[in-house]
A protein has these predicted regions:
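Non-catalytic interfacial helical region
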Residues: 105-115, 131-144, 148, 154-156, ...
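Short, glycine- and charge-enriched coil/turn segments that flank and shape catalytic ligand pockets
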Residues: 1-2, 165
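C-terminal accessory "lid"/substrate-recognition subdomains
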Residues: 146, 153, 162-254
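Nucleotide-state-sensitive switch-loop elements of NTP-binding domains
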Residues: 2-142
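Short, surface-exposed, polar/charged, turn-prone segments marking secondary-structure boundaries
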Residues: 65-68, 90-91, 98-99, 120-124, ...
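Short, ordered loop/turn segments at secondary-structure junctions
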Residues: 41-43, 159, 188
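Short conserved AdoMet
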Residues: 32, 88, 149, 178-179
Length: 254
């Protein structure tokens, strides 16, 4: 059960093109009467609908239906701290990850920092899955596998693009990958807001049973955010060489 003194947080994840931003825009445009703060990653494939924005001059801005939205331009912990200065304007946080992100380190944030842990409660992780492309994505991306493995709720989206028998086989595969997640089928990310919020689904004990190293740093350095670099050439230097567990793909993204 969520603590009445903490702000509940849902992490919204899913591979590129799965429908995360479509769902966010739906939530931000509906008159649902809820006061939701949306944390949108600046490097998402598609931004929020600017027609819904009242004032976007600052990092945190208000939407036309009373929700507020902010963009991660650096350290997530700093953004959460700034958001808490407007605590009287929201009751819930919806946090979108990038399509290429493993949600595990994002979820870690709410347990590894004492101040964050005292103010926020991780309510659940919702993963959107593109029914039309997920089989190919699972074959070439570890991140898409982790997004499904960490999910408390899986939204099997774009079901109108897949034949019924293929859809049944896909849902069976997803349930084999994550035996505890609730699976909902949808088109155009059209789901009830109750499917995403107030889940009371994240279970730290269960996560530690499935991922024993969840509360341990994944790499020997702290993640401080994502930063944009101007075009040009850069040299990356790592003390003692790269960690042997880091893949070439990870180094290329760095």
């Amino acid at each position: 059960m969520n603590s009445p003194t903490k702000v509940p947080v849902t992490i919204l994840t899913g591979f590129l093109g799965s429908g995360k931003t479509t769902l966010l825009n739906r939530i931000l445009s509906e008159e649902h009467g809820k006061r939701i703060a949306v944390i949108e990653n600046e490097y998402g494939e598609v931004g929020i609908d600017q027609a819904l924005v009242i004032n976007a001059d600052e990092e945190i801005f208000e939407m036309s239906n009373g929700c507020i939205c902010c963009t991660v331009r650096g350290d997530l912990i700093r953004v959460l701290g700034n958001l808490m200065k407007r605590r009287d304007k929201f009751d819930y946080i919806l946090l979108e990850t990038t399509g290429l992100a493993d949600p595990g380190p994002v979820a870690q944030t709410f347990f590894m920092d004492d101040e964050i842990a005292s103010e926020f409660s991780l309510d659940g992780i919702v993963t959107l899955v593109d029914a039309h492309h997920i089989n190919q994505q699972l074959g070439r991306s570890q991140e898409s596998t982790e997004q499904i493995a960490f999910a408390d709720v899986i939204l099997l989206n774009k079901t109108d693009l897949v034949k019924a028998e293929e859809l049944d086989a896909l849902e069976t595969r997803l349930r084999e990958m994550n035996r505890l997640a609730r699976v909902h089928r949808c088109e155009r990310a059209n789901v009830a807001i109750s499917t995403v919020l107030n889940l009371e689904a994240f279970n730290l004990e269960q996560v530690l049973a499935d991922h024993p190293t969840f509360l341990e740093p994944e790499y020997p350095f702290e993640w401080t955010g994502v930063y944009a670099l101007s075009p040009g050439s850069y040299e990356l230097s790592l003390d003692d060489g790269p960690d042997p567990t880091m893949s070439l793909a990870m180094l290329e993204r760095l």
